[in-house]
């Protein structure tokens, strides 16, 4: 415990510049970034009861929720989007609700959703 008390005492005596340099060295040594931890820790102190920022979703799953009346058009669009064969695309469409494509960017997910909805399907992004 005496060693820990000495470390605390040494850290307390650092100047702001020395503390910043220490943080930089520790980030390099441990392969981490203190910026996110500092921002989250400083957020509630500065804003009182402010919540931590919500992380924006970057990967989406396009889910075929319902086929609608134009089953053939939806099958064609699923084939174009996924690259599946006719039978595989038909099986996927008939098994709705079913994921069509997983791990895609928001832009690509929106394009796929628009194309499938234009073909007559009901689509969800998750």
Curated annotation (Swiss-Prot):
<dbReference type="GO" id="GO:0022625">
    <property type="term" value="C:cytosolic large ribosomal subunit"/>
</dbReference>
<dbReference type="Pfam" id="PF00542">
    <property type="entry name" value="Ribosomal_L12"/>
</dbReference>
<dbReference type="InterPro" id="IPR000206">
    <property type="entry name" value="Ribosomal_bL12"/>
</dbReference>
<keyword id="KW-0689">Ribosomal protein</keyword>
<dbReference type="GO" id="GO:0003729">
    <property type="term" value="F:mRNA binding"/>
</dbReference>
<comment type="similarity">
    <text>Belongs to the bacterial ribosomal protein bL12 family.</text>
</comment>
<dbReference type="InterPro" id="IPR013823">
    <property type="entry name" value="Ribosomal_bL12_C"/>
</dbReference>
<dbReference type="InterPro" id="IPR008932">
    <property type="entry name" value="Ribosomal_bL12_oligo"/>
</dbReference>
<dbReference type="InterPro" id="IPR014719">
    <property type="entry name" value="Ribosomal_bL12_C/ClpS-like"/>
</dbReference>
<comment type="subunit">
    <text>Homodimer. Part of the ribosomal stalk of the 50S ribosomal subunit. Forms a multimeric L10(L12)X complex, where L10 forms an elongated spine to which 2 to 4 L12 dimers bind in a sequential fashion. Binds GTP-bound translation factors.</text>
</comment>
<dbReference type="InterPro" id="IPR036235">
    <property type="entry name" value="Ribosomal_bL12_oligo_N_sf"/>
</dbReference>
<dbReference type="Pfam" id="PF16320">
    <property type="entry name" value="Ribosomal_L12_N"/>
</dbReference>
<dbReference type="GO" id="GO:0003735">
    <property type="term" value="F:structural constituent of ribosome"/>
</dbReference>
<protein>
    <recommendedName>
        <fullName>Large ribosomal subunit protein bL12</fullName>
    </recommendedName>
</protein>
<comment type="function">
    <text>Forms part of the ribosomal stalk which helps the ribosome interact with GTP-bound translation factors. Is thus essential for accurate translation.</text>
</comment>
<dbReference type="GO" id="GO:0006412">
    <property type="term" value="P:translation"/>
</dbReference>
<keyword id="KW-0687">Ribonucleoprotein</keyword>
């Amino acid at each position: 415990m005496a060693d820990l008390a000495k470390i605390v005492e040494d850290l307390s005596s650092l100047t702001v510049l020395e503390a910043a340099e220490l943080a930089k060295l520790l980030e390099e040594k441990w392969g981490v970034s203190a910026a996110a931890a500092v921002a989250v820790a400083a957020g509630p102190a500065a804003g009182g009861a402010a919540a931590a920022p919500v992380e924006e979703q970057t990967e989406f799953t396009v889910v075929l929720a319902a086929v609608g009346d134009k089953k053939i058009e939806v099958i064609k669009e699923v084939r174009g989007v996924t690259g599946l064969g006719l039978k595989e695309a038909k099986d996927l469409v008939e098994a709705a609700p079913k994921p069509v494509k997983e791990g895609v960017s928001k832009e690509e997910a929106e394009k796929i959703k628009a194309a499938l909805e234009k073909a007559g399907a009901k689509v969800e992004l998750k």
